Amino acid sequence: MKIDRDRLDYLMKDAVQGFTRYLGLVPLSLKPGEFVTRIRLQKKHFQQDGFAHAGLIATIADHTAGYASFSLVPADRRILTIEYKINYFQPADGDYLECHGKVTKPGRNILFTEAEVYSIKGKSRKLVARAMHTMASVPASRVSRPSDT
């Protein structure tokens, strides 16, 4: 499967709005069933001990896996997370978080994904979390989207 240029442009723009824009998420690459994103860590992202907050790590994993799924469904469908499980391996203390999301089992209505989150500091890259998701593909008409403000 190939993503046409209009769909690719839409997905790359759509991935950064609202909360993800506030967090500073940047899409790096998108191909069918795979999405890579990055966040430059700032003071607002850290918890009390100076590491990237676990909620931030979970958010980038969920969002990136969601858009990996979104790349495989028709334009008249949306992706919603049904459930996910995340394992944290070590604190994220780098300059960036980078997430690689991929669809492991596509389906018409249900998709299964994985996401790996890395902490990047200089040339060093360490795996800090891995998540598994179950995603639902639903008709866009069933999902009300607020305007982007």
Language-model region placement:
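Terminal targeting signals and extreme-terminal segments of soluble enzymes
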Residues: 1-149
